[in-house]
A protein has these predicted regions:
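Acyl-donor-binding surface of acyltransferase catalytic domains
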Residues: 1-23, 187-189
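A short beta-loop-alpha structural element at the N-terminal edge
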Residues: 27-40
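Conserved acetyl-CoA-binding loop-helix of GNAT-fold acetyltransferases
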Residues: 115-130, 151-155
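Conserved GNAT acetyl-CoA-binding A-motif
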Residues: 130-142
Length: 194
């Protein structure tokens, strides 16, 4: 993985290759790079269209996406043929030094790969690389209706912090015009700052 500290490379390496339950082929987790962007953008757009993934109404361009997410906190999951099955990325929650170890993550899995353990592999890779980089808290903001994502995050140690009531108004999809609640979850490092 180019451009990442060696510890991050080592932390991510343990999750690959892996055969998800119900999946016919091994899945490789790698650093998300610009060459993956067309597939990542498509998966992002598919998630947006469901109305259950984000308030965003369209994916950003590569430059905007990459600018806010450090390379060592961006990963893709690919099958043996190199097809991108999903992605995860995290960005700092604040520029203030006191929050230097706090990030917010997003994880998206292509519908054809849902239920095969891809999301779990991606979040495990992010957790490992985040801890290797000194991150002590990973936050996730999830719509209450997205029960699969809530369950996945809780299985990996994310705990509900609270509900942000009517956090934003949807501009698109099946919930267009509605004010939506978001559940805030966080995963606190067991090794950093404990």
């Amino acid at each position: 993985m180019s451009g990442t500290p060696p510890l991050v490379d080592d932390a991510v390496r343990w999750v690959r290759p892996h055969t998800p339950r119900g999946g016919p082929s091994a899945v490789t987790v790698a650093e998300l790079q610009e060459r993956h962007w067309p597939a990542v953008r498509e998966i992002y757009a598919t998630g947006i269209a469901t109305g259950q993934a984000t308030f965003e109404s369209q994916p950003p361009d590569w430059a905007r996406f990459a600018a806010g997410k450090p390379a060592h906190l961006r990963h893709v999951a690919m099958d043996e043929g190199g097809t991108v099955l999903g992605w995860v990325a995290a960005s700092p929650v604040s520029a203030r030094p006191v929050y230097a170890g706090v990030v917010e993550e997003s994880v998206y899995v292509h519908p054809s790969a849902a239920g095969r353990g891809v999301g779990r592999l991606l979040l495990q890779a992010l957790i490992a690389s985040a801890e290797a980089a000194g991150v002590w808290t990973i936050e996730a903001k999830i719509f209450p209706e997205n029960t699969a994502s809530l369950a996945l995050h809780q299985k990996l140690g994310f705990e509900p912090v609270g509900v942000r009531r009517r956090l934003g108004r949807m501009s698109h999809g099946p919930h267009a015009g509605q004010w939506r609640d978001v559940i805030l979850l966080e995963r606190r490092s067991a090794t950093i700052g404990s």
